[in-house]
C-alpha cells in the first residue's frame, strides 16, 4: 500500500511538472520571432504546403494541439480536425469571424493569443491563414 501511495505521489508530481512545461509556457523565442519558417504567398495558399506545415511547426506539438493533447479540445494535425472538428474554428470564406484567426491575432472573446508567449506567428503567417480561409479553406 505504501508503495502504491508513493507511486501515485510521484506520478502526480511528474504530471504537474509536465503541465508547467506545456503549451502555455513555451517562451523559447525572442519577441517578434516566429516559431516557424513557413512563408505564405499573397494568394493561392495551399493547405498542404503552407497551412499544415505551419501548424506542424508551431501548433500541432506535444502538450499543445496534437492528437494526444488537443489543448482546448482542438487538434491541428489534419484538415478535418482544423476545419470541421470544432464548429467555428474556421468559418469558410470568413476569416474575420473564424476563431482560429481571432486566436492567432489575440482578439475577441477567445482568451489568450496563440501560440502563447513569445511564440507568436509573424504577420505574413497570420495574413496567410486569413487568405487561406478567405479563399475557401480548401484542402489543397
Question: Could you tell me what each predicted segment is?
Answer:
Residues 1-10:
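Bacterial N-terminal signal peptides that target proteins for export
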Residues 18-22:
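C-terminal motif of bacterial Sec signal peptides marking the signal peptidase cleavage site
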Residues 27-130, 139-140:
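Solvent-exposed helix-loop boundary motif
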Amino acid at each position: 500500500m505504501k508503495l502504491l501511495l508513493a507511486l501515485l505521489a510521484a506520478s502526480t508530481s511528474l504530471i504537474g511538472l509536465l503541465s508547467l512545461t506545456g503549451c502555455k509556457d513555451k517562451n523559447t523565442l525572442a519577441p517578434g520571432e516566429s516559431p516557424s519558417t513557413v512563408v505564405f504567398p499573397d494568394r493561392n495558399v495551399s493547405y498542404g504546403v503552407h497551412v499544415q506545415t505551419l501548424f506542424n511547426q508551431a501548433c500541432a506539438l506535444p502538450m499543445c494541439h496534437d492528437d494526444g493533447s488537443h489543448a482546448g479540445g482542438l487538434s491541428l494535425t489534419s484538415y478535418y480536425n482544423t476545419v470541421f472538428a470544432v464548429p467555428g474554428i474556421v468559418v469558410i470564406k470568413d476569416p474575420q469571424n473564424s476563431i482560429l484567426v481571432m486566436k492567432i491575432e489575440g482578439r475577441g472573446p477567445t482568451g489568450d493569443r496563440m501560440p502563447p508567449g513569445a511564440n507568436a506567428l509573424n504577420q505574413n503567417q497570420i495574413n496567410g491563414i486569413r487568405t487561406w480561409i478567405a479563399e475557401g479553406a480548401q484542402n489543397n
